Amino acid sequence: MTSNRKNENEIINALSIPAVSNHSAQMDLSLDARIEDSLCIAEGNNINPLVSASTVQTGINIAGRILGVLGVPFAGQLASFYSFLVGELWPSGRDPWEIFLEHVEQLIRQQVTENTRNTAIARLEGLGRGYRSYQQALETWLDNRNDARSRSIILERYVALELDITTAIPLFRIRNEEVPLLMVYAQAANLHLLLLRDASLFGSEWGMASSDVNQYYQEQIRYTEEYSNHCVQWYNTGLNNLRGTNAESWLRYNQFRRDLTLGVLDLVALFPSYDTRTYPINTSAQLTREIYTDPIGRTNAPSGFASTNWFNNNAPSFSAIEAAIFRPPHLLDFPEQLTIYSASSRWSSTQHMNYWVGHRLNFRPIGGTLNTSTQGLTNNTSINPVTLQFTSRDVYRTESNAGTNILFTTPVNGVPWARFNFINPQNIYERGATTYSQPYQGVGIQLFDSETELPPETTERPNYESYSHRLSHIGLIIGNTLRAPVYSWTHRSADRTNTIGPNRITQIPAVKGRFLFNGSVISGPGFTGGDVVRLNRNNGNIQNRGYIEVPIQFTSTSTRYRVRVRYASVTSIELNVNLGNSSIFTNTLPATAASLDNLQSGDFGYVEINNAFTSATGNIVGARNFSANAEVIIDRFEFIPVTATFEAEYDLERAQKAVNALFTSTNPRRLKTDVTDYHIDQVSNMVACLSDEFCLDEKRELFEKVKYAKRLSDERNLLQDPNFTFISGQLSFASIDGQSNFTSINELSEHGWWGSENVTIQEGNDVFKENYVTLPGTFNECYPNYLYQKIGESELKAYTRYQLRGYIEDSQDLEIYLIRYNAKHETLDVPGTDSLWPLSVKSPIGRCGEPNRCAPHFEWNPDLDCSCRDGERCAHHSHHFTLDIDVGCTDLHENLGVWVVFKIKTQEGYARLGNLEFIEEKPLIGEALSRVKRAEKKWRDKREKLQLETKRVYTEAKETVDALFVDSHYNRLQADTNIGMIHAADRLVHRIHEAYLPELPFIPGINAVIFEELENRISTAFSLYDARNVIKNGDFNNGLSCWNVKGHVDVQQSHHRSDLVIPEWEAEVSQAVRVCPGRGYILRVTAYKEGYGEGCVTIHEIENNTDELKFKNCEEEEVYPTDTGTCNDYTAHQGTAACNSRNAGYEDAYEVDTTASVNYKPTYEEETYTDVRRDNHCEYDRGYVNYPPVPAGYVTKELEYFPETDTVWIEIGETEGKFIVDSVELLLMEE
């Protein structure tokens, strides 16, 4: 490309340097001439002495070759790689280990002690001999794997070399010398981890026991974390120690950052990919970090002219340069167009310079929108800008001239020329160079070649094929007389298209995305090979879920893949993964890290999605954070190709691990305590889905193990009928003969489930392998839908903790109780999902209509146990629940047992649950033992107090109930027993506490027997009373039913009672009643008169024989036979027994004795237990209506009436005001 130039006679001082006189100019010209003569000797291809090309070359070469042998490489690849590795680290020339050490020493200006140096070099020399010996033995064995002698030799040398390098590593991290030794340490650690990988690759063939192979593997995992954390820690320490205040210190700081990224952090980022169990086939990794070559500014000025070096030319401060050059974390992008703007610095026709003064760069993330950044001066039109095209081009090399001009005695630093060498990675024949070139006749030039700092991976091929890095961005250091571009580079492994091949695992870093919502790119922790993506919490707003979207390309349309995600979180998080438009995974994942701000190597976890798919599913992979209160970091997505054989082997290995994980490591016939019944069912599904074609024998063997595990699970489960074959209905507490059935119910409850009629048993579905139950909502909280069972005392061990657990498909307002000394309680809301099946799955139904549990589906983590244990309501994102309870001393006679209760008491509530277990967890010791003993004592003390109070309350209530009847046969009421007296007696009966459990008033408590005894007699009294009162609906509880109405009347609720209200004098209510002629009746009315006039209740026959009761607002004393009644005194005609307690008026009968009972609260008030035994208005509401006393002002009157015919009329009316009637009774007298 031809650059545009201006006329040399034009002087454009873009830097606004002040003009000077001709005399001064001439004088300074002579000075400049002398300076120019001195500087000319510095022209040429000079290299900064701080940059050691051989050091960087070795690091780049090793990392590049490792990228080609990740996972499980072919044997030929591995042999070639080890030969290369030995040749790189122990060549015939100068020792690279010494170069590593000296290079870091020079950068940080700290030397190790002579003893440290000599010891390290000597030990490394020994390791080199051992490694070369091992490499030769490995090649010999690979040529003939069946040769016993070769196998014996390689195993012997492997064990010796591994032990040698294990003991050598500490010599490379001497205290206070960790930073200068860091590059040596990283290379040695890399050798050790590669060697440990060989045990997994070849150990079995060499004759190692499987336990030895596993031990080496576990050491590899442990050392991976240890080595990674050490390298990152001391890299950060060394870098922070180099922070300074001026430009020269920034130059050294940047060189350390670049060179140790190449020689240390790039290796560390590849360590996890040596794991052959996670990466069992060839693996493609990518490094997305950015590094910065040195600024294009003169640094080699001769002695005496140091001011012409860019960093001495009034350069910006350290922090200003870092802010201008270092890019904040961002999605990976690629430059597409660079426009360079120029300015002129001219002293004379023989000394002038046009140079790079600003630029505009267009760049784009993969598949994303175009972005633009500008730096420096971009609005100057005096010199035409130069535009360079980079779209689809990798700029693999830059060559730039740093020029210097002198104005008077002031140096001007700038770049008059730069060449960008490129190649199209999709078309290797499209290669060339594009150039920025401006006129320059200055006093010195220095060439900066990026290959000096970032050499190709090998010199055996052309650099356009073997380049290691590509240009990614350009910054600009700006001073008064200074412009120094800084090139930013990414590793070549981070491709432009996120291409996924068919024969290898492909790692796609999340920062290679195109769209990020409610999240951010954050600096990587140092061991990830680049930055990572943080998805924020949504704070309960589902429209605000953090989301990252990454475009992908498949080279094969037929290959099936699985996706794996590497993530980190400090709490359990709910993650959703989509492919194209299909959601393929939604699950609650366990926490992996203690902090997201200081991540360590072991703080990342993997979640593998078993749903296999092809390229037809979509060309986008995305992750959403469904969590309301938790954040998650996404490092990368990994695409694992799935072949029929690979999938069968993978499924078999996964099933074998799952089955073996059911049992303890010390006893393969003993089930682990934390293995749930639901988990066993899911493992059985996993085994059932294994291929009969590839692993029939293994499948049968695994099935036997799973069946055995299921039997063990059933044996330890103390619940009866855990698979829900039958649910019994609620029994009556009274048998036919009226005696309490409490004992039989207590016993029957220990033999299966009891529940309300709306609780249903469902057959297994895509979530449950066996039966499960559903609890629907209810319209009345006093009549909940429930399910319960009692664990009998004979099943329990003294001083032992037990655990209730199970699996909830979904629920809202589900209350769970464990009850012994008191109640342990949780309310669980478990979100469900509309479908377990991704959109790509057409039919989750088997051939016979059964759930197809082998089809790809959304998976919930069966191992995650997340339960609220503070008694508070909580929204679970785990479908598992656990609730534990401690048992103290056991007493078979008392048979306290443990009640297991599930309850829904809201209209919106529901639950689907199954795989319920009640198992022994552990014996109680220490504090837990002391706590349960204290709780047990408190409970017994409370019960003793309760017994004393119950005896007094029961005696009073029994006397009152007995007084309602004529004798102890309880088949006839006393003649003067009225409805208010029955209600009063009933209220006394309900003062008996602990008749039922407050958590579920269908379960008998310790006073159920005596309560039911008296309650049955109250029911008898009501029945006898209803039979005796010949007026229908006399209490108006059914409105105006059975009454004839004239005019406007109403029935109103007042104080929870139904009252007839006659507001007008012309209104009337009447009822015809059948009676027995010649018998005597008592007409009893409770009413209240408002205003003037009278309220009248009249009884009469067709002709004559009329009588009436009149009510006034304030009556004078009226005399009734053997009784009196006064204004606002509603004493009824009770005969001579008016003062007897059973004959007291409503107010007296319902008067509450505040000293009659104690406040029954739970005694087990330990922190982990929840107090639910507080006042509960539904506690004894089993058909009982708690009638309050009639308010003051009501009067009860009665009269005797002897009908002469078989029909009488009851008429209710008034003369004025308002008449309110509570009840009307017509009672047959006893003969």
UniProtKB/Swiss-Prot annotation:
UniProt GO molecular function: signaling receptor binding; toxin activity
A Pfam family recorded for this sequence: Endotoxin_M
Disulphide bonds in the chain = none
Keywords, alphabetical: Sporulation, Toxin, Virulence
Listed InterPro entries: Cry1Ac-like_dom-VII, Cry_V, Galactose-bd-like_sf, Pest_crys, Pest_crys_dom-III, Pest_crys_dom_I, Pest_crys_N_sf, Pest_cryst_cen_dom_sf
* GO terms (BP aspect): sporulation resulting in formation of a cellular spore; symbiont-mediated killing of host cell
The job of this chain, per UniProt, is described as: Promotes colloidosmotic lysis by binding to the midgut epithelial cells of lepidopteran larvae. Toxic to Plutella xylostella.
Q: Which PANTHER family match?
A: ENDOTOXIN_N DOMAIN-CONTAINING PROTEIN-RELATED (PTHR37003), PESTICIDAL CRYSTAL PROTEIN N-TERMINAL DOMAIN-CONTAINING PROTEIN (PTHR37003:SF2)
Q: What else is known?
A: Toxic segment of the protein is located in the N-terminus.
Family, per entry:
Belongs to the delta endotoxin family.
Protein name in UniProt:
Pesticidal crystal protein Cry1Bd
Which gene is this protein's source?
cry1Bd
